[in-house]
């Protein structure tokens, strides 16, 4: 599908190549680092900010393509529950999902890394500038919108139209989610695949992607901002 080729399908291939590189590199996986939000222009904060905003904006283009394709078939983003018709319900459900997944996900990562199945994930390595936290929050929101709209809502819709069974669609969506996180290691693949299963089941139940976007945004904000505040200050949080 064109949408996947332009977005997370390509990311999955890139992630696989990156994982092979990490796996064949001397030393263990946990001695290597995977940085999620890094500087594009070290020592040049305004240029760095411009690159950060450019990256966030262009990453959302496939979502605009999804909206266009849905409108062409007489639907729209409201069809997948990505609208403002039920904001408080979406916020409440998303917050509960994030609370349930967050602590379990962190514990799984720590165990996977300690066991040598995961790289050391560095959620952010941005300079200490005024725009650091706003950019991290925007990055979290961008990741969430792209992943949930494309890998859950749009992919499931297309697979349903192609006659795939609900189980086959669930497997396809969750394996794809795990695949584009494979650059983090085997733990990243398994953990995100499990999260994908949960998110697909919730989407099928609620018929709305809004709560999933909220949950994913809160999870990523917790990871990005939490790491920025705690890295090097607590013993249990791995750093390179």
Question: Which ranges hold each PLM region?
Answer:
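Arginine residue identity/basic-tract feature
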Residues: 30-32, 44, 72, 78, ...
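N-terminal, membrane-interfacial amphipathic/helix-forming hydrophobic leader that caps
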Residues: 1-79, 224-240
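Interfacial transmembrane-helix boundary/kink motif in multi-pass membrane proteins
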Residues: 1-8, 40-51, 75-106, 128, ...
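Alpha-helical transmembrane segments of integral membrane proteins
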Residues: 2, 6, 50-58, 89-97, ...
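Transmembrane helix-loop-helix hairpins at the membrane interface
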Residues: 10-12, 102-106, 110-240
């Amino acid at each position: 599908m064109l949408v996947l080729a332009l977005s997370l399908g390509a990311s999955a291939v890139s992630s696989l190549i990156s994982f092979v590189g990490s796996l064949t590199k001397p030393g263990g996986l946990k001695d290597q680092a995977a940085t999620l939000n890094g500087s594009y222009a070290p020592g040049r904060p305004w240029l760095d900010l411009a690159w950060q905003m450019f990256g966030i904006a262009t990453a959302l283009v496939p979502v605009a393509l999804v909206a266009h394709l849905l409108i062409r078939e007489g639907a729209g983003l409201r069809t997948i529950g990505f609208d403002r018709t039920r904001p408080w319900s979406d916020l409440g459900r998303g917050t509960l999902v994030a609370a349930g997944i967050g602590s379990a996900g962190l514990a799984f990562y720590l165990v996977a890394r300690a066991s040598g199945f995961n790289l050391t994930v560095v959620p952010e390595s941005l300079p200490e500038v005024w725009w650091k936290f706003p950019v991290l929050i925007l990055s979290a929101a961008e990741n969430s919108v792209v992943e949930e709209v494309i890998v859950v809502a749009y992919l499931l819709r297309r697979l349903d139209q192609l006659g795939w069974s609900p189980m086959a669609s669930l497997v396809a969506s969750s394996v794809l989610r795990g695949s584009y996180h494979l650059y983090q290691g085997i733990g990243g693949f398994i953990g995100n695949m499990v999260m994908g299963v949960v998110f697909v089941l919730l989407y099928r139940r609620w018929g709305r992607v809004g709560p999933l976007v909220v949950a994913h945004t809160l999870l990523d904000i917790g990871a990005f901002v939490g790491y920025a505040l705690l890295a090097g200050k607590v013993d249990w949080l791995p750093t390179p």
